[in-house]
Amino acid sequence: MYSSGIDIVDVLRIKKLHERFGERFLHKIYTKGELEYAFSTKEPYLRLAARFAAKEAAAKALGTGIGKVNFKDIEVVLGTDGPELIFHGYAAKIFQEKGFTGKSLSLSHEKKVAVAICVMWRD
């Protein structure tokens, strides 16, 4: 069985949220590693928007939506073949309880938008 989630995020929305709420916003949503990666690039808000979309897409694929899962329970890391998801806390618990055995993440972005799709499956 497969489960999927998709999300699209306006890059400017992420920048405006950071400007409005400051570091508090960033530290509520992103892990230390995600922030270090994003701000080491020329376009940090593009990277942050892609990770925000990934977290939303993964929460949808888990079947919970982001309301029940903490944003930081879903982490995006750079794997050898592209972005990968690492689940912590409640997200890891739900992934295991639902019997998922694998997950895949794809990110894409342009200047103004970022999109993510997440697929999970059971063997």
UniProtKB/Swiss-Prot annotation:
Its cofactor is Mg(2+). One of its GO terms (molecular function) is holo-[acyl-carrier-protein] synthase activity. GO terms for biological process: fatty acid biosynthetic process. It is found in: Cytoplasm. Transmembrane segments: none annotated. Signal peptide: none annotated. Belongs to the P-Pant transferase superfamily. AcpS family. It comes from the Bacteria. GO terms for cellular component: cytoplasm. Keywords: Cytoplasm, Fatty acid biosynthesis, Fatty acid metabolism, Lipid biosynthesis, Lipid metabolism, Magnesium, Metal-binding, Transferase. Its EC number is 2.7.8.7. Transfers the 4'-phosphopantetheine moiety from coenzyme A to a Ser of acyl-carrier-protein. Mg(2+) binds at residues 7, 56. The gene is acpS. Its main location: cytoplasm. NCBIfam families: acpS (TIGR00516), pantethn_trn (TIGR00556). SUPFAM superfamilies: 4'-phosphopantetheinyl transferase. It holds the Pfam family ACPS. It catalyses: apo-[ACP] + CoA = holo-[ACP] + adenosine 3',5'-bisphosphate + H(+). It is an enzyme of class 2 (transferase). This is Holo-[acyl-carrier-protein] synthase.
